[in-house]
């Protein structure tokens, strides 16, 4: 079989990646045609073709996050590469091993005004430094880069390809699936000493892990953190911020002496206040380069702990009571019909209908926060969300990528495990092109996307932007109603759609998806003009 020098270089590059990846997302283009034909000739890789590089890069990111291994996205030159920047930013801050493999014009064309040609070297800045490859003897840099200590970071390999790009015949099929190997190489910040005789509270966020020695400590855990043994509701932070609380004639000290941060918590302002309180001793545990210390006053930073002392039963009771009061308050507010059917109700329905073995994806903004308020995380449910830079970009693609990664773990099962995704309407519309899956591409076999549609930006109702004095310009600047027909959009992409407008019908629709496979969008039409009052009612329960 004949081949061009460009194809020889492309094959060497894919050969160097294949031991580390199982999935590659491919975008069509001319300059990357040697890579495209080589990838489709491989029998050891799953290839997912997408036409939009931004959505494609988020598909690759979610595959990598869910599988905890590298996934590559491949594209042609020019703006195609620039479209990957949002996904690269999320990958860098969430420590996801996303690989961007871009085709480029040869150096002699850069700066000449040649079509579809920009300077791609350094296009992602320090988020993913560029490794340039122009010759066969430079391909070894790929393996060297992937072997570096900081394995959980994005990479950018920029492959300069000159004409002739491809030979007239297709490459022969080759490659035997043997299973890619990958090991995360975490950063060790050392051991710190923790005295559990002090009133200690753990706050666990994204990238948290089960820390030996802290298993029984009261823990505020975000939905993407492991389920703690002694969970504390996030709204309880409002109670624990107080020096003392009076109840039934007793006065108890509720403020913790020591807060231990594990991973990267970011969701709740009250929780962040606990982390930032200079009167509270702060320990930060991390296995990455990010030290989550919003108040910049950490007393110690480590990755493991040496435990001394024992927890007081009174402190455990205080945390349990504060948590129970907060959780009951949320359910009381949900039962209050004056707020109507809101995004918080949608999150409660999703959480209440999850089963052991399900996987949950939640986009940034209100969905992940609402899930936290209604009781996540749960045992037996893996939860994923973009918490690196917490953008709404690529949410549909990430939901699909999560489902594809989950079903790839169980190729021999008659029915793929269930994946449920909770998105807001703006997140859904922002990445509506993510629904476009070609007829020959792997498709989600058991995915339900729930869209909480309040016709705009509901989160801004809860922030300073929702204040009465700003209401005259609120709708245009923040509410941004769109009046889009999600049903028609789904029909255009060939995706099954169901519409509900109340809690009971939503629960029925979600339960129905546990009985059948397929790819379904459930649109829950909600209100947002009561979200601010609903939030104030929640705060009243704990203040």
Swiss-Prot record:
Catalyzes the thiamine diphosphate-dependent decarboxylation of 2-oxoglutarate and the subsequent addition of the resulting succinic semialdehyde-thiamine pyrophosphate anion to isochorismate to yield 2-succinyl-5-enolpyruvyl-6-hydroxy-3-cyclohexene-1-carboxylate (SEPHCHC). Its EC number is 2.2.1.9. Pfam families: TPP_enzyme_N. Belongs to the TPP enzyme family. MenD subfamily. The gene is menD. Keywords: Magnesium, Manganese, Menaquinone biosynthesis, Metal-binding, Thiamine pyrophosphate, Transferase. One of its GO terms (biological process) is menaquinone biosynthetic process. GO terms for molecular function: 2-succinyl-5-enolpyruvyl-6-hydroxy-3-cyclohexene-1-carboxylic-acid synthase activity; magnesium ion binding; manganese ion binding; thiamine pyrophosphate binding. The keyword Metal-binding applies. Its cofactor is Mg(2+); Mn(2+); thiamine diphosphate. This is 2-succinyl-5-enolpyruvyl-6-hydroxy-3-cyclohexene-1-carboxylate synthase. It catalyses: isochorismate + 2-oxoglutarate + H(+) = 5-enolpyruvoyl-6-hydroxy-2-succinyl-cyclohex-3-ene-1-carboxylate + CO2. HAMAP family: MenD (MF_01659). Pathway: Quinol/quinone metabolism; 1,4-dihydroxy-2-naphthoate biosynthesis; 1,4-dihydroxy-2-naphthoate from chorismate: step 2/7; Quinol/quinone metabolism; menaquinone biosynthesis. Homodimer. The keyword Repressor does not apply. Binds 1 thiamine pyrophosphate per subunit. It comes from the Bacteria. CDD domains: TPP_PYR_MenD, TPP_SHCHC_synthase.
